[in-house]
Regions:
Chain B
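Alpha-helical transmembrane segments in inner-membrane proteins
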Residues: 1-344
Length: 330, 344
């Protein structure tokens, strides 16, 4: 099968899987709803208003935000890896997650309980991206990690001074899809509509850039503006995803990696394939996180409601190891 | 014993190294004294020394039971971290290697967090060794990933990914605990010397001492590694064994410190760079004592600042070292290297 045929197959399969995930999410939850009731609630014909609230206001936004944030993280990962020319980079490498967390913490410390959290996260992430572009020209990877460390330290400092928002901020740092509302989805989907096509339009230039900077410049690519645009799109995608779901680790690393295994390094195929894979990956991990409920020895209560970021970290570690093995063999 | 000629890249008179080391030691002693004097209540140096020597002194508890072990722990932990950084940087020939960027610290943190949050009841003396297991595992994975590359960006990316994985694990562990554990957990994500007493010092000091002794014994071989694997092999140094030993020692040092103080970042990265800059030599064996002293000095001074700057709120020292360490590291690295043309 040619890579492009495989890409079509992967995208089609991914869309089917996404549909199955939506169904699975709608059917599972704390309260046990029969399938017929779920369908009736979806089309607005349920006789129980409570069912409509559960399905339309709790379950549907959660799965949609998960799918959308996963796609954005994966595309951001593709772009960051292309800029850094290293398959081990991911959106977190740019420090935007730490920037978003700092902005959220600052907002919560200054105005407790204020609904400014979403714009704060978005602006914090975007501002971090801007700083990175200015200071990181020499090595985006090193600068991003160091920038992230400094921002995280300032966040911790704020939390030491005022420890009230710790719970919220930790969930941001890890990433959680618990308690998403229709508002979250309304804030997320415009980003999907804008960022994903733009990333795809950049794909052929990313292929040229992958040849190396001298070759790319020789082929007529203007490195400065090109890098600025790619970084902007990558940061915007990561910022939108992080503002909606928190800084979920490894989706932006694993989805492009699996995508490369399936369709190769051509970015025109890699961008859509990674987006689909990221969406499925995050939503699947969320389903697992949501369904897990185990009794551990030594603990009083059942373990449940684990943030999805913890699950992706657990799943991501073995993938990281295999990735690393491949890298070291090269 | 293998005799290796003096192979410093920029050799300067040895007296400068001795001079700088003595000056740093004096500074560290001054910081130690200041750490004993400052606090609530603050006293003069004479009163502080009197409290140390006189068992009946009214400030005996504050100075000897609280301030002294904390300051000594800072010295010991800082020395251990500095030498860990030196071992990693020279054995891997990577200027940006350090336990915090190689995932070693975060591997240890996972274990410590699990012990604390799950209330496993592991005795204090055993904790560094369990933490060492986590540190070695994370460090081994990262080293496997890095392979033969010396590209700092690659190293940083692998380390960051490992730290992210460990961070996720820590949060997963905390998610297992009760709601009240969140604040406790948060404290364990930050390196701090607060509320550490003699038992912590007694746990860490022997391990750090052993680690420093090991580094001293290996100093010539590691210095040979800085010349390149082929040259080192030509000089009769077992390259792989030396590298593994150096990394293992660094992991031991970092794990011992992380078990007692949590992840304190950037002391390990910064101390060797500062020492090399101050002495003008890159020779491992020459800067080794200074790196230990400089690490201790950095950590005690940072802890002093962390205690006093925002008084009455106390800043965990890990925050202070990061806020100071990153800009300092960037400055130190910027002057040394010419700007490469290629981004990456």
């Amino acid at each position: 099968m040619t890579p492009s045929a495989r890409a079509v197959a992967v995208v089609a399969g991914g869309l089917l899987a996404g549909l199955a995930l939506v169904l699975a999410h709608l059917l599972t939850g704390r309260s046990d709803l029969p399938a017929g009731e779920v369908v009736r609630a979806l089309v607005g014909r349920s006789e129980h208003p409570a069912y409509e609230v559960i399905v339309l206001d709790y379950r549907l936004p959660r799965v949609l935000v998960g799918l959308g944030a996963g796609a954005l993280l994966a595309v951001s990962g593709v772009l960051v890896q292309a800029v850094v020319r290293n398959p081990l980079a991911e959106p977190a490498t740019t420090g935007v997650g730490a920037g978003a967390a700092l902005a959220v913490t600052g907002t919560l410390v200054l105005w407790p309980g204020h609904p400014l959290v979403y714009p704060a996260a978005l602006l914090g992430a975007l501002a971090t991206g801007a700083v990175l572009y200015v200071v990181g020209r020499r090595s985006f990877a090193v600068a991003g990690v160091l920038l992230g460390a400094v921002l995280a330290a300032v966040t911790s400092l704020l939390l030491v001074v005022d420890s009230a928002p710790i719970g919220v901020v930790l969930r941001w740092l890890v990433g959680s899809l618990n308690a998403r509302t229709p508002v979250d989805w309304a804030q997320l989907w415009p980003w999907l509509v804008v960022v994903l096509p733009v990333a795809w339009l950049l794909a052929s230039r990313l292929n040229v850039w992958a040849l190396g900077e001298p070759a790319a410049i020789g082929l007529g690519l203007r490195a400065g503006p090109f890098l600025a645009v790619v970084l902007l799109v990558a940061v915007a995608a990561a910022a939108a995803a992080i503002a909606a779901a928190g800084a979920v680790a490894f989706v932006g690393l694993v989805a492009p990696h699996v995508g490369r295994l399936l369709v190769g390094a051509d970015h025109r195929l890699l961008v859509p394939v990674s987006a689909v894979l990221g969406a499925v990956l995050l939503s699947l991990a969320d389903l697992a996180a949501f369904s897990v409920s185990v009794q551990l020895p030594g603990l009083a209560t059942d373990v449940s409601g684990v943030p999805v970021g913890a699950v992706t970290a657990l799943l991501g570690a073995p993938v990281l190891i295999s990735l690393v093995r491949r890298e070291s063999r090269r | 014993m293998i005799i290796i000629p003096d192979c410093s890249v920029r050799s300067r008179p040895h007296s400068r190294t001795v001079l700088v080391t003595v000056a740093a030691t004096a500074l560290a002693a001054g910081c130690l004294l200041a750490a004993l004097c400052l606090g609530q209540p603050s006293v003069g140096p004479a009163a502080a020394l009197a409290a140390v020597t006189d068992p009946e002194h009214p400030l005996r508890v504050a100075v000897v039971e609280v301030r002294l072990p904390r300051a000594l722990l800072g010295l010991v932990a800082g020395a251990g971290l500095g030498v860990a950084g030196l071992l990693l940087q020279d054995a891997l020939r990577n200027p940006i290697a350090g336990p915090e960027l190689l995932g070693v610290s975060s591997g240890a943190t996972v274990v410590v967090a699990a012990i604390v949050v799950l209330g496993l009841g592991v005795p204090l003396a055993l904790q560094p060794w369990l933490a060492l297991g986590g540190a070695l595992l994370a460090g081994a994975l990262v080293l496997l990933a890095i392979g033969r590359t010396r590209d700092p960006a690659h190293v940083v990316l692998v380390g960051a990914a490992m730290s992210a994985a460990c961070g996720g694990l820590v949060v997963a562990v905390v998610g297992l605990g009760t709601q009240g554990n969140v604040v406790v957990l948060f404290r364990y994500l930050l390196g701090s010397l607060a509320a550490r007493g003699w038992p912590h010092l007694e746990t860490v000091a022997p391990i750090v001492g052993a680690g420093l002794a090991g580094a001293w014994l290996l100093r010539r071989r590691i210095e040979a590694l800085t010349l390149g694997d082929e040259v080192a092999a030509g000089l009769g140094v077992p390259v792989v064994r030396t590298r593994v030993a150096a990394v293992g020692l660094a992991a031991l040092l970092a794990a011992a410190v992380a078990a007692a103080c949590g992840p304190i970042a950037f002391v390990a990265l910064l101390a060797p760079h500062l020492a090399r800059r101050a002495t003008g030599t890159t020779s491992t064996r020459r800067v080794l004592p200074l790196v230990a002293v400089a690490g201790g000095l950095l950590l005690v001074a940072a802890d002093l600042a962390a205690r006093r700057l925002l008084y009455p709120v106390e800043m965990p020292v890990g925050i202070a070292t990061t806020l100071v360490g990153v800009p300092a590291l960037l400055l130190l690295r910027r002057r040394r290297q010419p700007r490469p043309a290629v981004t990456g």
